[in-house]
């Protein structure tokens, strides 16, 4: 049973001559890691903003647990490419910030924040200042903060796009570990083809002008990693390479058609 449903979603910004998204149908179910991939102009970020409730669709319906999505809510945790952390607070206060806004008592929210920091392998970082952290560590704090409120689904907006290649791979692997441990459904958007193929249980390819779904792939590479297989072995698997090259060809063809 799907937790999150998008039915015939369209989006058009005021003054624009064409919609940014048209007739999008998606569902996100338990233990699913749904990845949306597409070239510039395919509406990836707009799609995530609609699900997060930051903007309303022009048409169609978005529901979570059967209830319409109407504005932001704590049941949808969001991790941004820009870590959006509070530089004047320490790591613990940043992770506990949403719980503080919700009125959770200090001892309870700090205990939850420490639990989430341990989950993302930052157990010894609670008293660190944000400026003392690397880019990857900041993203771990952002992930811990999103999870602290125990959301029904986790939304990730190109979360590793600003990281170097080595740190990006580390964060991909950490995300799969967290996904396995928490069983949280994840919706992630990315422009990185290998990342999309490695992480997704379902990969949705978007075409631009207007953004629309052109292909869906059911994949198991991330599940294999979560089950204990090494990332190197998975990424050297001929089936992984074949899938990556197929997706690359589709993305390039969409870019050429929209040029």
From Swiss-Prot:
Pfam families: ABC_tran. GO terms for molecular function: ABC-type taurine transporter transporter activity; ATP binding; ATP hydrolysis activity. CDD domains: ABC_NrtD_SsuB_transporters (cd03293). InterPro entries: AAA+_ATPase, ABC_transporter-like_ATP-bd, ABC_transporter-like_CS, ABC_transporter_ATP-bind, P-loop_NTPase. ATP binds at residues 38-45. It is a peripheral membrane protein. Keywords: ATP-binding, Cell inner membrane, Cell membrane, Membrane, Nucleotide-binding, Translocase, Transport. It is an enzyme of class 7 (translocase). Its main location: membrane. It is found in: Cell inner membrane. Its EC number is 7.6.2.7. One of its GO terms (cellular component) is plasma membrane. Residues 4-233 form the ABC transporter domain. It catalyses: taurine(out) + ATP + H2O = taurine(in) + ADP + phosphate + H(+). It comes from the Bacteria. The complex is composed of two ATP-binding proteins (TauB), two transmembrane proteins (TauC) and a solute-binding protein (TauA). Part of the ABC transporter complex TauABC involved in taurine import. Responsible for energy coupling to the transport system. This is Taurine import ATP-binding protein TauB. It comes from Pseudomonas entomophila (strain L48). The lineage of its organism: Bacteria, Pseudomonadati, Pseudomonadota, Gammaproteobacteria, Pseudomonadales.
